[in-house]
Amino acid sequence: MQSTSKYNCDSDYIAGRNYNTKRTNGREELSTGLTNEETGVVNISDENNIFFKKNIDYVKGSRIGKYKLIKTLGKGSCAKVVQAEDCETGEYVAIKIIERTPKQLSDIRIYREALICSLFNHPHIIKLLDFFHTTEYFFLIFEYVDGQQLYDIILNKGYLDEDEARKYFRQIISAVDYSHRNSVVHRDLKIENILIDRNDNIKLIDFGLSNFYDADDLLGTFCGSLYFAAPELLLGTRYTGPEIDVWSLGVILYVMLVGKVPFDDENIHALQNKIKSCKFKFEKTISPEAQDLITNMILSSDARINLENVKKSKWTNLGYKNLTNNFMTLRKPIIEINKNILRALQAAMFFQFTDMERVLMQYLQICKGDKHSLEQTYWCKKPVVILYYLTMEKFNELNYKSIPIDIDTGMNTKSLIDITIEKQPIIIYNFVRFTNAKKNNNPYNLFFSRSVFEPEMEFLNMTKDVSLDSCNISEDENKKHNFPKIKQSIIKGLFKGIKIKNGDKDYVKNAIIKILLDLDITYEANEKSYFCSYSHSGVECHFKIDLYFNILLLEHYVVLNCLNRKKDNFKLVTELIKEKLEEIGDTSNYPENAI
């Protein structure tokens, strides 16, 4: 691959080149560097401490806890990665060493990476095995990958043929799809962060810039490598999350097939302007299908295709019978909250989510209502809910009640009030041990605890995925119930509502349902309101519709309330519905068989 002087390998993790799990006499050498089992603090000698500096190479005899260091695998701008041997098992691991800074934000990113990589269970995503810390360093112990970076493969070959690139790309989007479905956006996708193991399969690494995202909220942090960064990051606009990963995936595919980055310039400001323009050329002839896919991924955010369309594209599936497998389970509605799991998550995620119990209790009440309702699938995408599912999935169905590790081990109190930023590394250390306490060899995690999840629903007979796209509430199901109820009011709806000029309550409901069907808005009627989801041409919005009857004016009012922070999208949907209501007019213009 041709590269400019500015396009250098700067990964925090480099794959190892040699593979050997033969046990050495490391057990006899384990007399120093012992770990405090309650706090995760490793005792480091002054001599060994020198090695952990990013610019210092291997120092003979260095060790971290039970891990004997072998060699430096790579150095990045923020960390170094070393190969080490577990002196108890003889297995190799990769240890990411990050020097701690006074900035609290840097620590939070490390905590987040540790939590995500300890909870995720995907064949193409790197797994975190352990976590240690000192006052100066964090140590993230990952599984060891024998192989090389995708960067090195492209550099050696110049570019990849389309069949080879397609195989890697399908595995990459499988990993990214799994992340997105678990409400995590990577934000640093690039060829340096993709490893190819000795079996020619990929591993996605370095979740140091990742974050949880919510479709109802927006992110605003600039992250990642400039060459792979989406234009909205450079423009400083807020974003949901998955769309910036899709851009980066488009750049990765371009680099694999062409051998160059699509945007390049020695002047950083000129490079930024090129990226913002979204205009590039194909420097090498590739198939029309590949060109079409890349072109639709490297577009402005409002025109860019989503990951689902990438998965379904013609080029991605050439030669394959099925779409890529994201290795997601079908999650059942919960019927109770496991207090141990909740308490562990509250402690571990205290730096980001402070209302976990409230959110989970609200989700529990929704699950106790209609099974697989639109509202339940909507709430099931919330990061807090997903974190609960991910943690439960770490334990098999028989063992959740006897979870062996207390997340507060090493703390003087079990109260969340006692959690401080100083104690957070201890909590993260214990949480990683907590999630790895029960090893589960089943990569699919097919079954959940019958005591926590709905008992009467057998997994293998389930056909619905808990995604908003798969939940289509039929019109007949809604018409069976006389929902939502039209609430009588004097004030509500008068100022913010859309007035219905004529018609009784049946007419009003029929008009609303007709409009929702005409606009292809997925909806569900409950006792209080219509719960609605609209997604079209890049516009996505979740909202509810309440119906009121003013007892003084004898008029009906339709009130729309936005459920997320995408106000522009909500305004557009409101205008569409208002326009449709005006088109319908009074009852004389409304056909009796409209629905």
From Swiss-Prot:
Enzyme Commission designation: 2.7.11.1
The answer to keyword Nuclease applying to this record is no
Q: Where does ATP bind?
A: L73, G74, K75, G76, S77, C78, A79, K80, V81, K96
Q: Name one GO cellular component term.
A: cytoplasm
How far does the signal peptide extend, from start to end residue? Answer: none
| InterPro entries xref list | Kinase-like_dom_sf, Prot_kinase_dom, Ser/Thr_kinase_AS
The protein's topology relative to the membrane is: Peripheral membrane protein
SUPFAM superfamilies for this protein: Protein kinase-like (PK-like) (SSF56112)
Catalytic activities: L-seryl-[protein] + ATP = O-phospho-L-seryl-[protein] + ADP + H(+); L-threonyl-[protein] + ATP = O-phospho-L-threonyl-[protein] + ADP + H(+)
| GO terms assigned for molecular function | ATP binding; protein serine kinase activity; protein serine/threonine kinase activity
Q: Which keywords appear in this protein's UniProt record, sorted alphabetically?
A: ATP-binding, Cell membrane, Cytoplasm, Exocytosis, Kinase, Membrane, Nucleotide-binding, Serine/threonine-protein kinase, Transferase
Record's Pfam families? Pkinase
Q: Where in the cell is it found?
A: Cytoplasm; Cell membrane
Q: Which GO BP terms sit in this record?
A: exocytosis; intracellular signal transduction; microtubule cytoskeleton organization
Query: What's the protein here called?
Result: Probable serine/threonine-protein kinase KIN1 homolog
Q: Which organism is it from?
A: Enterocytozoon bieneusi (strain H348) (Microsporidian parasite)
What's the gene? KIN1
